[in-house]
Structures are given as C-alpha cells and as structure tokens.
Amino acid sequence: MADLVGRGHTPRGRRGTGSRPVAFLLGGSRGPIVSESAERRVPHPPPAVSAAALAVHRGLVEAGEESLLAGGAVRDLLLGVKPTDFDLATSAPPERVAELFPRTVLVGAQFGVARVLVDEEEVEVATFRADLEYRDGRRPVAVRYTNAREDAIRRDFTINGLFYDLEREEVVDHVGGLDDLAAGLIRAIGDPDRRFGEDRLRLLRAIRFSVSLGFPIEAATWEAILRHAAAVKDVSAERVRDELERMLVHPSRAEALRLLSRAELLRPLLPEVADMHGVAQPPEYHPEGDVFEHTALVLSHLEEPSFPLALGALLHDIGKPPTFEVADRIRFNRHDALGARMAEEVCERLRLSKRERDEVVFLVQRHLAFIAIDEMRPSRRTRLFDEEHFESLLALCYADCRGSHGDTSLPERAEEHYRAYLAAGPRREPILRGRELMKIGYLPGPRLGEILRAVEDARRDGELEGDETEPAIEWVRARYPLADERGEGGEP
C-alpha cells in the first residue's frame, strides 16, 4: 500500500475498466492542474443516463433552469463504470423543483436538496449552493444559492467536483478534477484542512475512494488527514457504520483496513481492532504474523461477503489482545467468548440492527466451532447446522484458515457433514409434542421445551430408535421424573 499514500503515480487502470488507463477514457492526456477560478470544458460523448434522470433534466431545462449531471455519477462515467445513481445540480431552488415535478420530496430543503420520483425511480436534485459556516463538523449552519462554479468548489475531492452538461455534451471542470482523474489521485478541493474541518466524514471517504479506485492520496491531502484523524471520533455512529459497510463489502476491504490504520483513523473508531497490532501468534499456526495481519488476510479471503460477515471477520479475533499469554506456547484462552462480548459492544456502538448484531456476535462466538467437527455428537452438529447464520460461519472458517496456515481441512469436513445433513431431506417430525407430555402431567414452560429438545437430541444420537411415541415417553419418565416436575421430593 506504500504507493497509495502521499504521491502521484503513472495513470493506470481501475477495477472494472480493464487495462485501459483513465486518460484514454477521458480522451486526452494530462494538462496542468486547473485553478478553482477557471472553467474547463471538454467535449465528451453523452453518457447513458437513466430515463428518469434524463426526464428531470429535460423538465428543468425546458423551464429555463440550468441542469448538470453532478458528482460521483460523472466520475464513474468517465472511468467507464456504470453509476448506481444519477444526481443533478441545478439553478432551480427546491420550491421551484417541487412546482415543476409534483412527485417531489424536499428531503433537505434547507440545504437545497430534493428528490423527484419518476416511474418509481428517485432522482436527487440539488440546487447550486455555497456552504456558509460549519460548526459541528458535519453540515453548514446555512447555505447560499449560487452558481455551478461555487457549488463545485465546496465539494470534497476534485474527482467528485465534476459536472456533465447534457445539452452541450461537455464535461465541466472548475477544480482540476479531470487532471486528477487522469493521473489517478485523491486530492481535496482547495484547502484540505478546511475540507476536513467542514465535514469529518470526508476523512473516511478519502480512504474509501483511495482503495476502491486504486488511487493514491495526494501528499497535502494525506498530511491533512493525519492532522485531523483524532476528530473522526466525532462523526455520528450511523455515518461511520455506513462508510465501514462500503469499505468492508468492497474487494479492497483488506487494503481499507491497512490504510485506515496508517491514516491513524482506526484507533479513534475501533480501538479494539487497533490493539491487534503487534500481538504475536504461535508461528506453527500463524506463519503470517501478528493478529492484525491475520485479520487483514482473513478479510482478503472472503468472497463477496455481506456486511455482517465482513464485520464478523474483522472482529473474529478481537478477544486475542486481552487474552494473550505465554505458557507452553502463545495462547489466547477463551478469546472467542470474550471476543463475542466485545463484538456486541462494537455493534451497539455502531448502531447496527439487532439482526446484524446477532449475526456478528454469533460469528465471533462460534468461529472455532469446527475444531472437533468429526467428534461432535450428531445432535450437536445438527443444532449447529440449523443455526440461521451457519453458512456465514462456514465462509468465515474457510477465510480464517486461508489467512493463516492455509489448511482448509476443517471447513471442508464441516461442509461434508453439512451437505450430508441437507441431502437427508426435510427434518423429521418430532417424536413427541408438548401436548402429549402435558396430558401425562408435565407442565407448560421453558422446562417442557428443554425436555422436547433433549428427546430429539437422543434420537439423533441413537439413544432413541424409530419414531414411536411410547418408548420416547418412557425415556422422558426415566430422565425427567414427574415428581421433580410437580415439586414432590424435588426442588419447589
């Protein structure tokens, strides 16, 4: 990752663009960086814009308003990547947009932002604006409607400050974004200290764009990131979570982790992960190095993970630093149990949903579950296979092995057992149901559920054969006497 920080490099291809350099896609070679006060227009064939965005653009232009394709969509189109969203910037204030398009929601009218619904597709329309004073490191206290040039120079990075004029079929550049896109550089617009002071989330966005595009961060921008890194802790948990998700589900997730650490952004956000640095592991099991390097490698071996799976991989060894000890060798006793509790705290801090949190905690808690997979009682294996997130656990175990010693025999054996379990067909009907036990005197409640689960475990383990009810009832009577159930001679 050394070439991704602090200096430029020869233009190169981007993920998804094949071997063509960016300069080729832009139709020209690099020129000098354009100052903020200059306007540069470069002819470019019209992009394949969504029908909804084109309809809104036409409506604005026909009403006498200026309308330009803006931001990330322009960047991606020039890189040869299909944008996921098409945003427009316009001279029309939000109220005017609402007049022109009845199905408009003013989601951020105080900041000049509206969403127009066209055939069930949303198009974001933002009024050209200049941001006034920032006080909270997130948003301006007020905005002033203005022109395209001032709108461009208040944005975060030069490659995101480009417009496309659909009428004149030209890229409009006020900030030198074309040159930085051709060179492959992440550069803050204007004064980087000011940009990061305005919105501290930009610190994380710089990292994400750098690793996802494969662009180095320009030197002055990088130095400003280091100066402002501690302030990232003031970004709201929800915004941090969203940026982490974008980084962790991207193929460059391991590079993102390493660069977050080098940028001094990891410790303010995830000190538990930062603590993995320098924590040695037994070399016979972990020839790759310390816990941090292992974690980065595990992330790199995931294949198109969901966010909970990727976060579970990031946190799976979070319990190792506090449990480190040297006995006969380096050991991390019960790091899975402690790690699960720590992971739950991280998930709560990041405001994850309960479903996401449950999956992450399950993955951390059970990431060693396959160590004795062949020796497990069939009932225990079945309970593991029936877990909602078992397949995520299997994917994590494969990545865990590939990110250390490379021996994947454990997850392979687990997968064999799992496939055999699936091939056996639908689950068998229970031998007993609660009503059958209640008829002979057992009481409803948690203990009844425990008894029924024990019956099914006994059948899986071969203690009960067949599907007959009477032998199962006798098995229950022998192990869960009714005297205990009624409190006669047992605990009240």
Model regions and ranges:
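Catalytic cores of the polymerase beta-like nucleotidyltransferase superfamily
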Residues: 1-492
